[in-house]
Amino acid sequence: MKSIYITGYMGAGKTTIGKALSQELQMDVVDTDQKIEEKQKKAIRDIFAEEGEMTFREYESEMLRSLPVHNVIITTGGGIIERAENRKWMKENGTVVYLYCDPNVIAERLREDTTRPLFQKKDIDAFVKKFESRRAYYEEAHIHIDTTNKSVKQIMNELKEKINV
């Protein structure tokens, strides 16, 4: 089976759904952000602060290409889709799943999360604007799932049906 790439904006449920799908399909799950942190030996927020977003995006592209393209679920960072080369890679090497969630619901979920470098609770308008600027890229995915106000079980049932497992 080709890899399954789970994309979506921060807080949409990528990690949660990736883990649930991993258990359901008995496949390994790999998180690109976690792998970058392990390789660089620092937290994503520190990479952003010390090296900048462009350097982080380079690390992200390199990591994406280093991962297996068969029998693995890959949960991606929210911005991985900003680079056309990454979108092309994922579409050619697997099934791309876009988890959509209403940005206002995401903002509520992330209100107290200090680990998100691009989320500033004081500036919800900028958060929504960033979300909208990426939306067309996310929508290039093979499969779209709206996670807004749905349980993990509901999302999983819909996802399994769409990926035919």
Curated annotation (Swiss-Prot):
Could you say which EC number(s) this protein's record lists? 2.7.1.71
Its subcellular locations are:
Cytoplasm
GO CC term, one of those recorded? cytosol
Q: Which reaction does it catalyse?
A: shikimate + ATP = 3-phosphoshikimate + ADP + H(+)
| UniProt main location, coarse | cytoplasm
Q: Which residues bind substrate?
A: D33, R57, G78, R134
Q: Which Pfam families match?
A: SKI (PF01202)
Query: Entry cofactor note text?
Result: Binds 1 Mg(2+) ion per subunit.
> What pathway does the UniProt record associate with this protein?
Metabolic intermediate biosynthesis; chorismate biosynthesis; chorismate from D-erythrose 4-phosphate and phosphoenolpyruvate: step 5/7
Q: Which GO BP terms apply?
A: amino acid biosynthetic process; aromatic amino acid family biosynthetic process; chorismate biosynthetic process
Q: Which cofactor does it need?
A: Mg(2+)
Q: Which GO terms describe its molecular function?
A: ATP binding; magnesium ion binding; shikimate kinase activity
Its assembly, as annotated, is: Monomer.
* Family indicated by similarity: Belongs to the shikimate kinase family.
Function, in words = Catalyzes the specific phosphorylation of the 3-hydroxyl group of shikimic acid using ATP as a cosubstrate.
Tell me what this protein is called: Shikimate kinase
Q: Which organism is the protein's source?
A: Bacillus cereus (strain G9842)
What broad taxonomic lineage does this protein's source fall under? Bacteria, Bacillati, Bacillota, Bacilli, Bacillales
Gene name, Swiss-Prot/TrEMBL: aroK
